[in-house]
């Protein structure tokens, strides 16, 4: 695979070229650009944003290539950039991005619609055996033979005016998206994997939409393993924290850290004095919120049992057999993926392997969703080998200790009951 790309697409000493672009900093020019770009077949775009000081990431710059026209849009210079988001949502074009999670969220938050025909080159690269998740610079180097400048990686994109060097640096983020997309699409067609990519993108976008419309209190770090009642406390305190952060346009964890939420839930008390005694709660900015936090705990304590959230059980991961089997299957999964020109990181994680084992060992709830490795294209590509591994018909062997992939799968005779 690497030889395929090096031979056809790699020019080792190539550098990025000087870029001509339009700088759009008022709403009239934005509308004119969007009207002209409405007939484009491809819209490749990227954003620059800052997320550490606000409740939601602050959009600072939009870079877009509409067929052969490249523009940099300054959302901080105008009140309304929704014409651009509506342009993305219009049918009839393909939207090309790299690692476009925040780009998708910006569009969804702005107009409540998806961009049309989403193509994420980071995900697509994993389907042809390149690493996942691969940085944009890595894909440019491997597939286009260019090297991106690195001088502006720590730019504060909120500050104005931006220099010509900063703007040109930003424009490079979309300059090669269409070219990389075409290379990946051709290889996907050769491998007959376009449908897999479409399924994965649809699943990925649906999960993002779901997360945007679902309370994310289960993502509080350290809350796994808490009882239903304590999870109810986590949920109530999280709701207060989220509302407070939104009203102050502040990162939620700057209002109250995750570990403090979990410790409050563990103590399971609505006593202000006991809450204040939690190490970390003595900070001045938290003192005025102690009564409110105590009220959150009290609400959770008064909930009927059936209204408390159920713990998300994925099996007892502390079982030594599950831990060892999870490690083994994760290693085996890597062998299967590399043999089929798939990025192991795209197919599944160590946790996905543990979930699969827990399911096969009957350690999950009967109403639990099927493990990720037993769904869709993943089940088709790795299912047969996974089943053979589970039944002792395949094993791992060291085939070449010096190779990039020293392990291989070895078929075994099917064991008999007396063997």
Where are these regions (language model features)?
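N-terminal accessory regions of nucleic-acid-interacting proteins
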Residues: 9-43, 47
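Active-site-proximal helix-loop-helix substrate-binding element of RNase H-like nuclease domains
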Residues: 11, 23, 63, 67-178, ...
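Short N-terminal binding/cap micro-motifs at the start of the first secondary-structure element
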Residues: 30, 52-54
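Non-catalytic, usually N-terminal nucleic-acid engagement modules in DNA/RNA processing proteins
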Residues: 44, 53, 61-64
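Short, glycine/acidic-enriched capping/hinge loops at junctions between secondary-structure elements
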Residues: 54-58, 72-75
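Accessory DNA-binding and partner-docking regions appended to nucleic-acid-acting proteins
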Residues: 164, 174, 180, 184-419
